[in-house]
Regions:
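Short acidic/His/Gly/Ser-rich catalytic and metal-binding motifs that mark active-site loops
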Residues: 179-182, 226-232
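ATP-binding/phosphotransfer module of carbohydrate and carboxylate kinases, centering on a glycine-rich
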Residues: 1-185, 190-216, 262, 280, ...
Length: 469
């Protein structure tokens, strides 16, 4: 079955059984670069500058505009820019190459352009108006990356928590061993009162701390962008009015730290996903993909350090079809619609599965998982569809990350459906991208680690200066 966009035709070897129009970004890019090899190329360089002065550069080649295929080139680079923004982040984008490409990107990523959400988000996170600099390839600044160690502190009595859109997890950990773990359902995205968020987090911490002889430190992970323990932007708090967000939510974890009187660190949930993977695998680099309410993603490099990148792959594209599934914030064909409970629900509904109207996504997933345990053939195809997404998605991520280990976890991978996702993703890599399959492994953690490993890894985030004796 051939699929076409912007004059580029792709022929996937494996079709998602319940989403046959899925057009993998990895296949589009491969076919485009075959075209580059056939008709000639010019260099194109992109670089993103962060608030700390770090520079992250990305190099590729495109067909010269005079040789045609401009529509495909513009699509490729616009999608690449969007991916890099959500992978690496930054307030200034350098586009070095053909002027037609640079000016197109500048118009799209503007306050009134098609990517105005991305423009506004980056401006907010980095507290500086987003800027696009159109220049030559030679004038693009080289990479100057900053990395830092993260967590791995296993001493003492700790609480770790993980805040998701549908549940909050917490673990009590003594010298690296979990002595208590639990999950509590909550609904933060519809809670406009900051006190709901405060009380929920404190409840999880206190319930876990009750299983410890003392509390030495607290570590947390949560969806969104957190800098120095302050919330910058996060979908968990989307219902909180901006004024209250600035007054109550931004300093929320600083308040909790001061009230508890112990060291506390809170970071993006994706970074802890990668940390959990690195700790369980004992190897690096690791890309962690947590398929939960949305997609949480994080990356640990070959040195075992985080990079300072955003790694918000929920908002990064993986599908190049026109009029594909929409993320309510970031637009078309992003990771949140392919690697999450949202994806499961989208595919299930499109396949004709019916649910009680008022049933939430977490409860729908539970019903789907129960049907999978009963051997439902349609549900098996649903999981094969998600697994196909994962396989082609990992191949695309390999264009942007140095990969060795990819760990998939989260509520969507719970139960026998998780094994189907894993096996199908490996099948896609072996059949379509054998060169990647030979060097990159995709794995699931064990069932217990899969559900609560995030909060246990989060507990290791803070260093304890002195352990009480």
């Amino acid at each position: 079955m051939s699929l076409s966009v912007a004059g580029i035709e792709v022929d996937p070897a494996i079709i998602p059984p319940l989403d046959p129009s899925f057009l993998p970004a990895s296949l589009f890019n491969r076919e485009y670069h075959k075209l580059v090899s056939a008709v000639g190329s010019v260099p194109l360089r992109l670089a993103l500058e962060g608030s700390d002065g770090s520079i992250s550069e990305f190099r590729t080649s495109v067909v010269p505009p005079a040789a045609g295929h401009l529509q495909a080139t513009l699509l490729l680079i616009e999608r690449t820019v969007k991916f890099l923004l959500w992978q690496r982040g930054g307030w200034k984008l350098y586009v070095g190459g053909p002027a037609e490409v640079g000016e197109h990107i500048k118009s799209v990523y503007s306050p009134t352009g098609a990517r105005k959400f991305d423009f506004a988000f980056m401006s907010s996170v980095y507290e500086h108006p987003f800027e696009v600099v159109v220049t030559s390839a030679e004038a693009v600044p080289p990479s100057k990356e900053n990395t830092m160690p993260l967590g791995r502190h296993l001493d003492g009595c700790r609480v770790g928590f993980d805040l998701g859109a549908s549940d909050r997890k917490a673990s009590a950990v003594i010298n690296g061993e979990a002595v208590f773990s639990e999950e509590i359902v909550w609904d933060p995205r519809n809670a406009s009162d900051p006190d709901y968020h405060y009380q929920g987090v404190m409840d999880s911490i206190r319930r876990a701390a009750a299983h410890l002889p003392r509390l030495d430190a607290v570590g947390g992970s949560a969806a969104g962008v957190y800098i120095n323990n302050r919330a910058r932007v996060a979908s968990l708090y989307r219902a909180v009015p901006p004024k209250l967000f600035a007054e109550k939510i931004a300093p929320l974890f600083l308040r909790i730290r001061d009230e508890l009187g112990v060291p506390m660190e809170v970071v993006n949930d994706g970074e802890v996903t990668a940390l959990a993977g690195s700790m369980s695998l004992g190897g690096n680099p690791v890309l962690g993909l947590a398929l939960g309410s949305s997609l949480a993603s994080g990356y640990v490099n070959r040195d075992g350090n985080i990079t300072g990148w955003l790694n918000e792959l929920a908002f990064a594209p993986v599908d190049y079809r026109m009029n594909g599934p929409l993320d309510e914030w970031s637009g078309d064909c992003c990771g949140s619609q392919f690697f999450s409970q949202q994806a499961v629900n989208r595919v299930a509904v499109s396949a004709g599965m019916q649910f009680p109207e008022k049933l939430g996504l977490p409860e729908r997933l539970v019903l789907i998982q129960k049907k999978m345990e009963e051997g439902d053939a349609l549900v098996a195809k649903l999981y094969e569809t998600i697994g196909t997404y994962v396989g082609y998605g990992v191949a695309y991520y390999a264009d942007f990350y140095d990969l060795k280990h990819v760990l998939i976890l989260g509520r969507v991978t719970t139960g026998p459906g998780g094994e189907i996702i894993l096996n199908k993703s490996i099948e896609v890599l072996r059949k379509e991208f054998p060169e990647i399959a030979s060097t990159v492994s995709i794995a699931l953690p064990d069932e217990k680690s899969r559900r609560v490993g995030q909060s246990i890894a989060a507990a290791s985030l803070p260093a304890i200066k002195e352990i009480p004796r």
